[in-house]
From Swiss-Prot:
Keywords: Cytoplasm, DNA damage, DNA recombination, DNA repair, DNA-binding, Endonuclease, Hydrolase, Magnesium, Metal-binding, Nuclease. Signal peptide: none annotated. This is Crossover junction endodeoxyribonuclease RuvC. The keyword Metal-binding applies. PANTHER family: CROSSOVER JUNCTION ENDODEOXYRIBONUCLEASE RUVC (PTHR30194:SF3). It comes from Mycobacterium leprae (strain TN). The RuvA-RuvB-RuvC complex processes Holliday junction (HJ) DNA during genetic recombination and DNA repair. Endonuclease that resolves HJ intermediates. Cleaves cruciform DNA by making single-stranded nicks across the HJ at symmetrical positions within the homologous arms, yielding a 5'-phosphate and a 3'-hydroxyl group; requires a central core of homology in the junction. The consensus cleavage sequence is 5'-(A/T)TT(C/G)-3'. Cleavage occurs on the 3'-side of the TT dinucleotide at the point of strand exchange. The gene is ruvC. Its EC number is 3.1.21.10. InterPro entries: RNaseH-like_sf, RNaseH_sf, X-over_junc_endoDNase_Mg_BS, X-over_junc_endoDNase_RuvC. Binds 2 Mg(2+) ion per subunit. It is found in: Cytoplasm. GO terms for molecular function: crossover junction DNA endonuclease activity; DNA binding; magnesium ion binding.
Length: 188
């Protein structure tokens, strides 16, 4: 499975592509950070991020995209910009029929380091080790994008099993309701 990991942002947006192999083996194929000037209009910044993401989607053909879920921060304008960038990125993937999954920062940290409260240095160190990189990915947005992709590779089987279980549960509920409705009609 080829996964594109995205750490969304307007000033810096981390992008990565990894491929998983046997077991927990993951190989990094590409990583970069898109930068936009903070003094540019938001629409221009979103367009710049979108253009680069669309190029990456066309060049790398990921099977799935993993985006960091925006969480509440103190700075509302930062949250808005991050959410807007994430929306533009998810839309680009959806237009190509690519599944998009969102992971919280604590899910990513727990998957990569074993500690949902790990700091940036710990995440970067583990990403470097997991991918057997010669150098630490910089800036932190690049490491975060790789961590998101790794997280999804490792969580995808569980996500698929949960979806199957939910679908089976829905079928059982529907069958049970039909049975009960039939029994009610029979008693009338």
């Amino acid at each position: 499975m080829r996964v594109m990991g995205v750490d969304p942002g307007l000033t810096r947006c981390g992008l990565s592509v990894v491929e998983n192999g046997r077991g927990s083996q993951v190989v990094a194929l590409d990583v970069d950070v898109v930068r936009t000037p903070s003094d540019a209009p938001v629409s221009k910044r979103l367009l710049a991020v979108s253009d680069v993401v669309e190029h990456w989607l066309d060049a790398h053909h990921p099977d799935v995209m993993a985006i960091e879920r925006v969480f509440s921060q103190q700075n509302v304008s930062t949250v808005m910009g991050t959410a807007q960038a994430g929306g533009v990125i998810a839309l680009a993937a959806a237009r190509r029929g690519i599944d998009v999954h969102f992971h919280t920062p604590s899910e990513v940290k727990a998957a990569v380091t074993g500690n949902g409260a790990a700091n940036k240095a710990q995440v970067t160190a583990m990403v470097t080790r997991i991918l057997a990189l010669q150098a630490k990915p910089t800036p932190a947005d690049a490491a975060d994008a790789l961590a998101l992709a790794i997280c999804h590779c490792w969580r995808a089987p569980m996500i698929a099993r949960m979806a199957e279980a939910e679908a089976l549960g829905a079928r059982h509920r529907q069958a049970y309701r039909a049975k009960v409705a039939g029994e009610v009609k029979a008693t009338r």
